[in-house]
């Protein structure tokens, strides 16, 4: 089990990303736009850099919904490999069967 502080930190990051998403998209559009003046592009770059680090979606980490484990998480299920295996063995995951050949 991951520490509660780590789970809460990740939750806080998700909220921060959602809060700044629209503004970040606008600033990135200005930076990429070649028709915008160099001054406007520079100001957008500086404004983007002044935003909190956690406003970037790249800093979010996928975690297991049950244990909070940061590694070995399957995106499709949102579960860590251990908990996914346990759920599959119980038959809780429809269509998922243990490989046998």
UniProtKB/Swiss-Prot annotation:
<dbReference type="InterPro" id="IPR023036">
    <property type="entry name" value="Ribosomal_uS14_bac/plastid"/>
</dbReference>
<dbReference type="GO" id="GO:0003735">
    <property type="term" value="F:structural constituent of ribosome"/>
</dbReference>
<dbReference type="GO" id="GO:0006412">
    <property type="term" value="P:translation"/>
</dbReference>
<comment type="subunit">
    <text>Part of the 30S ribosomal subunit. Contacts proteins S3 and S10.</text>
</comment>
<keyword id="KW-0687">Ribonucleoprotein</keyword>
<dbReference type="GO" id="GO:0015935">
    <property type="term" value="C:small ribosomal subunit"/>
</dbReference>
<dbReference type="Pfam" id="PF00253">
    <property type="entry name" value="Ribosomal_S14"/>
</dbReference>
<dbReference type="GO" id="GO:0019843">
    <property type="term" value="F:rRNA binding"/>
</dbReference>
<keyword id="KW-0694">RNA-binding</keyword>
<keyword id="KW-0699">rRNA-binding</keyword>
<comment type="function">
    <text>Binds 16S rRNA, required for the assembly of 30S particles and may also be responsible for determining the conformation of the 16S rRNA at the A site.</text>
</comment>
<protein>
    <recommendedName>
        <fullName>Small ribosomal subunit protein uS14</fullName>
    </recommendedName>
</protein>
<dbReference type="GO" id="GO:0005737">
    <property type="term" value="C:cytoplasm"/>
</dbReference>
<dbReference type="InterPro" id="IPR001209">
    <property type="entry name" value="Ribosomal_uS14"/>
</dbReference>
<comment type="similarity">
    <text>Belongs to the universal ribosomal protein uS14 family.</text>
</comment>
<keyword id="KW-0689">Ribosomal protein</keyword>
């Amino acid at each position: 089990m991951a520490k509660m502080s780590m789970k809460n930190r990740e939750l806080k990051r998700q909220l921060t990303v959602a809060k700044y998403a629209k503004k970040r998209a606008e600033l990135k559009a200005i930076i990429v736009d070649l028709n915008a003046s160099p001054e406007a592009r520079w100001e957008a770059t500086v404004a983007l850099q002044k935003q909190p680090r956690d406003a970037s979606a790249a800093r979010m980490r996928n975690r297991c919904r049950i244990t909070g484990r940061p590694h070995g998480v399957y995106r499709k299920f949102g579960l860590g490999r251990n908990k996914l295996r346990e759920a599959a063995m119980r038959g809780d995951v429809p269509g998922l069967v243990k490989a046998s050949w």
